[in-house]
UniProtKB/Swiss-Prot annotation:
GO (cellular component) term, any one: cytosol
Molecular function, one GO term: methionyl-tRNA formyltransferase activity
Record-given protein name: Methionyl-tRNA formyltransferase
Source organism of this protein record: Pseudomonas putida (strain ATCC 47054 / DSM 6125 / CFBP 8728 / NCIMB 11950 / KT2440)
Disulfide feature: none
HAMAP family according to UniProt: Formyl_trans
Gene name linked to the record: fmt
Binding site for (6S)-5,6,7,8-tetrahydrofolate: S109, L110, L111, P112
Amino acid sequence: MRIVFAGTPEFAAEHLKALLDSPYEIVAVYTQPDRPAGRGQKLMPSAVKALAVAHDIPVFQPQTLRNADAQAELAALKPDLMVVVAYGLILPQVVLDIPRLGCINSHASLLPRWRGAAPIQRAVEAGDAESGVTVMRMEAGLDTGPMLLKVVTPISAEDTGGTLHDRLAEMGPPAVVQAIAGLADGSLQGEIQDDALATYAHKLNKDEARIDWTHPAVELERLIRAFNPWPVCHSTLDGESVKVLAANLSTGQGAPGEILSASKDGLVVACGDQALSLTRLQLPGGKALSFSDLFNSRREKFAAGKVLGQ
């Protein structure tokens, strides 16, 4: 079977690795154009491109798939199937129709819940009990196609956006390989999604990461986990930015953002309802540290009565 793979970040690269180890032929890889990254803003290839180049697979990086030249280029590959994972470009219907068996997508949620760009983080933020990967047939709508296969994992009280991402990146690739086999032998039939159950996972916005201490502690604790490792929740103290990488629910009352107490166990801050004990922070110019380490060296900075977010 001739497969074209389309994807961009590390999550997608894990899927490509599994396909390279499968019996199927990967005839080409599509990925986003190289982007500036790092302090030097040097153009860097995507994780998928780096993997494809290492395996001598032809790489295509069109700005869009909406023009006739890009579509003709894809059609010339004569693909039986296109596998799409976190690619980042919209595939118009004419592109979806090119492969003999159509296009399938590995999406990091239990569809129809969390269609869209940031399903992993939104699941943690919402306090969902479980997440997973859905392999679906693609159609013109955003993550609306018939579902071929689902794999499920519980979301623990300790899961972050990062830990859930890594777990789903392990679960998704074998599911895709299994789905391809089911498509090839006709044993897998798609299940239509119930649009009434759909929710939308909006793209992450850095502005969302600014902590609003008037919100309930339980919501903020989930947000802090969801946004770790990116974009990382933050607040201000003494006019300086403070990144908050981990927190636990605590008790206590005070003005939102007020420091209620500080000890090696954590920095207890009042919220709109209850309080949070901040256990891992990063100050400007420093690395992320447990609060017990910060407390030993910067005790005066975290005096009770000070207010974060002002």
